[in-house]
A protein has these predicted regions:
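Active-site-flanking beta-strand signature of metal-NTP-handling nucleotidyl enzymes
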Residues: 44-49
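Extracytoplasmic
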Residues: 10, 19-42, 53-85, 90-131
Length: 131
């Protein structure tokens, strides 16, 4: 009985992660949403660019970018507060992500990019319901 309940809970958790709602505002801008990040292979990396506390500011940042398809936005919790994270690209290896981080387009702005494992991003995404 307990095993069946644990199996149901595990299935529900996987389903919730797989069925994250897409972020229509982000997709309308031509960028990627949390569901795209969740669909990427666990061994990969993305480049975290910037974190905003206001959704409108995060969307405005994406709007300013030329090639929005390279950008993704997701919501997570940081120190108990909702924040909006902008990341750039998906890379199969850390070395590929490091090389891309060193060559970011000028419109990204003066930032300190963080090469972040996709597994870590997926954990952050699962901490809060996406819009």
């Amino acid at each position: 009985m307990a095993s069946e309940e644990a199996d149901r809970e595990a299935q529900a958790a996987r389903a919730n992660l797989a069925d994250l709602p897409t972020d229509a505002d982000v997709q309308e801008l031509g960028a990627r949403s949390a569901s795209w990040l969740v669909a990427q292979a666990d061994g990969g990396y993305t480049i975290q660019l910037i974190v905003y506390t206001e959704r409108s500011a995060a969307l405005a940042y994406v709007r300013r970018q030329k090639n929005r398809r390279d950008f993704a936005m997701f919501k997570t919790l940081s120190q108990g507060r909702t924040v909006y994270v902008i990341s750039y690209g998906y890379y199969a290896s850390q070395s590929a992500a490091d090389a891309a981080a060193a060559e970011l387009p000028a419109e990204v702005g003066r930032i300190e990019p963080w090469v972040r494992p996709i597994g870590s991003v997926k954990t952050a995404i699962s901490s809060i319901a996406q819009d």
